[in-house]
């Protein structure tokens, strides 16, 4: 009778290796960042975002708009533009910060937006203007949506600012 113990051990090792190779993609997929959609909605935010322990999380401080009219009073809305203009300026700054870290807007998993009531909108935050700027960066060509909160605040540290945005980004 032949000794099959070495052959049996080799077969078991090969089977274990094959199983590991077959399961590896499933395990890697289980570790992906998951964006949970809002049921029955096409609104461009995520209901929630799940981040695996293998991801690195980056907290980006609140960013404010750049000056768009250097001739205007630097403490006036005219210096920074309307809510849409300010939103685009702030998100462009965030995009540049992320790029400097090897990240992109698709890596943003959480966003907090602070909008000041706009005198041109009877003291209410211009959410329509904000969304017009926001959707240039999220929900179109770049489909990854963050969990997001938008709140109206009494004011920001410069009376010309209508928008401040802070984000959290994550990448495996």
Task: Give the residues covered by each predicted segment.
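N-terminal secretory signal peptides that target proteins for export/translocation
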Residues: 1-10
């Amino acid at each position: 009778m032949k000794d099959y113990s070495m052959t049996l051990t080799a077969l078991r090792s090969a089977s274990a290796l094959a199983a590991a190779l077959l399961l590896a993609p499933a395990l890697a997929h289980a570790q992906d960042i998951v964006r949970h959609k809002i049921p029955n909605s096409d609104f461009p935010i995520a209901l929630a975002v799940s981040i695996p322990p293998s991801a690195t999380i980056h907290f980006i401080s609140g960013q404010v708009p750049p000056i768009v009219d250097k001739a205007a009073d630097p403490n006036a809305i005219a210096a920074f533009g309307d809510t849409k203009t300010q939103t685009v300026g702030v998100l462009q700054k965030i995009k540049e910060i992320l790029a400097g870290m090897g990240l992109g807007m698709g890596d943003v998993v959480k966003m907090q937006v602070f909008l000041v009531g706009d005198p041109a909108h009877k003291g209410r935050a211009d959410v329509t203007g904000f969304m017009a700027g926001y959707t240039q960066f999220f929900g179109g060509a770049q489909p990854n949506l963050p969990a997001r909160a938008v709140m109206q605040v009494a004011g920001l540290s410069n009376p010309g600012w209508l928008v401040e945005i802070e984000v959290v980004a994550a990448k495996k």
